[in-house]
């Protein structure tokens, strides 16, 4: 089944509202209508879902999101992996593609939504206290945890998966509306990390790690 090029379902009410405002604005003043129409086009742009060619290497772990790597750090992950892990934090600006993708194939084993604050996503402590959604995926090689985190502008997390779902690598997990951060936790002893702080990555394309062995 082909994915839509624009996530119309998730952006439906934004597009309807702006479509109506475009017509009303044009009736009042041409330039006002044009301004609202440009905003309408930006929202279409924001909800875009470009086609991605997923790497076939079964040991490759791909980025779950587009954006810039904010940090790569060794941590102790306590929600799902429950042990030593490498955390890769990816910041998404409002101009990035905002869908999240499965970094590996496997079964969704864990989903947990935690309420919190809405601090700017680039703040270091935002990842600890902002609202977020945890998605744990398991396959015969490893367990991976993806965390969708809200930001100051991004206040709506959409998840497409539930426990028990079987995912293909690169399959859509969900999206975060209007700027955000996505984190991925990889088991430290199992994975070789291939990205570094400041690097731009692309969801479904960039190989951020490889399973050892």
Swiss-Prot record:
Site description Cleavage (non-hydrolytic), residues in chain: 179-180
Cellular component GO terms, alphabetical: plasma membrane
Bilayer topology: Peripheral membrane protein
HAMAP family given in the database record: PS_decarb_PSD_A
Enzyme Commission designation: 4.1.1.65
Main location: membrane
Gene: psd
Keywords: Cell membrane, Decarboxylase, Lipid biosynthesis, Lipid metabolism, Lyase, Membrane, Phospholipid biosynthesis, Phospholipid metabolism, Pyruvate, Zymogen
Cofactor: pyruvate
Cross-referenced InterPro entries: PS_Dcarbxylase, PSD-A
Keyword Lipid biosynthesis: yes
BP terms from Gene Ontology: phosphatidylethanolamine biosynthetic process
Keyword Membrane: yes
Role of this protein: Catalyzes the formation of phosphatidylethanolamine (PtdEtn) from phosphatidylserine (PtdSer).
Active site: 180
Protein name, entry field: Phosphatidylserine decarboxylase proenzyme
Substrates-to-products reaction catalysed: a 1,2-diacyl-sn-glycero-3-phospho-L-serine + H(+) = a 1,2-diacyl-sn-glycero-3-phosphoethanolamine + CO2
Recorded GO MF terms: phosphatidylserine decarboxylase activity
UniProt family annotation: Belongs to the phosphatidylserine decarboxylase family. PSD-A subfamily.
Subcellular location: Cell membrane
Species this chain originates from: Carboxydothermus hydrogenoformans (strain ATCC BAA-161 / DSM 6008 / Z-2901)
Note on how the cofactor is bound: Binds 1 pyruvoyl group covalently per subunit.
Modifications made to the protein after synthesis: Is synthesized initially as an inactive proenzyme. Formation of the active enzyme involves a self-maturation process in which the active site pyruvoyl group is generated from an internal serine residue via an autocatalytic post-translational modification. Two non-identical subunits are generated from the proenzyme in this reaction, and the pyruvate is formed at the N-terminus of the alpha chain, which is derived from the carboxyl end of the proenzyme.
Oligomeric form and interacting partners: Heterodimer of a large membrane-associated beta subunit and a small pyruvoyl-containing alpha subunit.
Modified sites of kind Pyruvic acid (Ser): 180
Pathways involved: Phospholipid metabolism; phosphatidylethanolamine biosynthesis; phosphatidylethanolamine from CDP-diacylglycerol: step 2/2
PANTHER family listed in its UniProt record: ARCHAETIDYLSERINE DECARBOXYLASE PROENZYME-RELATED
